[in-house]
């Protein structure tokens, strides 16, 4: 089941702190509907309803999707409205990392909010520009992020290799998790196809395939780190 990350800038999320901000309570949009993002993807109204109604696991709050670290706060309210997924949360009092994050948010040195979610193959359709998501299977976490939009893809690397089922999934993974542009991802897939085809025809291209695999491993991603 592929895991996806979608990030909005604070201008789009309309993030604001409650009162004087000392309690670290803030609210805004973690996702906006019918908006074509930098990947050419669109999330439709109602996409989060299934996850919000049925999942029992709490949605975690992290900074930059660092799920291996202590959460920086908790989400008190998650709800869809006509615009998107509106959230309200509180940064953890006494948590040094949360205090630093609050200062950065108020100063404007972090710029986005991002959702990490899982989808199944039937939950989205492919369009010329990207994908249209009509259903979210599980909302894993919502992070405050340093960078908005597609810059975050190279940091979060949330899309799972285990969820890859098609060539298009590979292209999307290379773009979303590794940070390649769409043209770079398509070009790399073409090289793989050529190498594998030659191998099947007995040309002995094992060295070329291994070189391509090594080039992927050397990409500056944060997978598993």
From Swiss-Prot:
InterPro entries: Peptidase_S78_dom (IPR054613), Prohead_protease (IPR006433). Pfam families: Peptidase_S78. SUPFAM superfamilies: Herpes virus serine proteinase, assemblin. The active site is at residues 65, 114, 141. One of its GO terms (molecular function) is peptidase activity. One of its GO terms (cellular component) is virion component. Protease involved in virion assembly and maturation. Belongs to the HK97 prohead protease protein family. NCBIfam families: proheadase_HK97 (TIGR01543). This is Prohead protease. It comes from Enterobacteria phage HK97 (Bacteriophage HK97).
């Amino acid at each position: 089941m592929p895991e996806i990350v979608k990030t909005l800038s604070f201008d789009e999320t309309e993030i604001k702190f409650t009162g004087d901000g000392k309690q670290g309570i803030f609210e805004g949009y973690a996702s906006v509907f019918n908006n074509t993002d930098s990947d050419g993807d669109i999330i439709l109204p109602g996409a989060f309803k299934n996850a919000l109604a049925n999942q029992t696991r709490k949605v975690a709050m992290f900074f930059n999707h660092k799920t291996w670290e202590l959460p920086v706060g908790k989400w008190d309210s998650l709800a869809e409205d006509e615009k998107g997924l509106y959230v309200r949360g509180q940064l953890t009092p006494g948590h040094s990392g949360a205090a630093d994050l609050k200062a950065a948010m108020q100063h404007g040195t972090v710029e986005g909010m991002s959702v990490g979610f899982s989808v199944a193959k039937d939950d989205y359709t492919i369009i010329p520009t990207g994908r249209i998501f009509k259903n979210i299977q599980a909302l894993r976490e919502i992070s405050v992020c340093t960078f908005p939009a597609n810059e975050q893809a190279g940091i979060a690397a949330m899309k799972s290799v285990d969820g890859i089922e098609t060539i298009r999934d590979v292209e999307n993974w290379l773009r979303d998790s590794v940070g390649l542009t769409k043209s770079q991802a398509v070009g790399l897939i073409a090289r793989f196809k050529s190498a594998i085809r030659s191998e099947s025809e007995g040309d002995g291209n094992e060295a070329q395939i291994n070189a391509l695999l090594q080039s992927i491993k050397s990409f500056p991603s944060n997978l598993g780190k």
